[in-house]
């Protein structure tokens, strides 16, 4: 619900929402966003960020929806966001929990947890795209919030970079799926790996494309295990003449 007496212009720049709310005594303002909702492997990561009063000065003008930026740019902005943040948190929801509750419920749960883990309860919460209740304070859903509200954009960066780092770490355990490349999202290469090896513990078994490969025959299981061992042993080895 839009707060009474607060005029928020979408053309006021990335910091327009925070400035308007703080002027009306509704600060500090937390932005919340997630990463990994559309993936079929790996966790969902939800972040909450409260920018400090000098956030506008300390943050690069490149701050925008993390999905529009390169991985290298996001990594640099991640450090900038943490320096500019008065408070922040990140919540990691594993694939098993997503399978139990569904990704939408997991997303809402993650948003509530992220706000609850902030050091101080915010005066207002801005969410990206859809309304969420249960923060213990007022909130507002902002359409395309990660492109128009700085605190949501900052949360998007924290969530995306945190999840990318997790997926790169998982790649060292499951090299055959190439998680470092596609980060658990559906690609032709990922689909081919699923068909060949079946899902691993980090795949979301409730997803249709994963479930299709979730119950291989005993013979196929044996072959896929051999493939995994071979892929792991050859990872990083370059054939020479």
Swiss-Prot record:
Major enzyme class: hydrolase
Record's keyword annotation contains Cytoplasm: yes
Homology family: Belongs to the RNase HII family.
Binding site for a divalent metal cation: 33-34, 128
Protein name, as recorded: Ribonuclease HII
Assigned EC number: 3.1.26.4
Requisite cofactors: Mn(2+); Mg(2+)
Protein purpose: Endonuclease that specifically degrades the RNA of RNA-DNA hybrids.
UniProt xrefs under InterPro entries: RNase_HII, RNase_HII/HIII, RNase_HII/HIII_dom, RNaseH-like_sf, RNaseH_sf
GO-annotated biological processes: DNA replication, removal of RNA primer; mismatch repair
Originating organism: Frankia alni (strain DSM 45986 / CECT 9034 / ACN14a)
Any Pfam family matching the protein: RNase_HII
Predominant subcellular localization, coarse grouping: cytoplasm
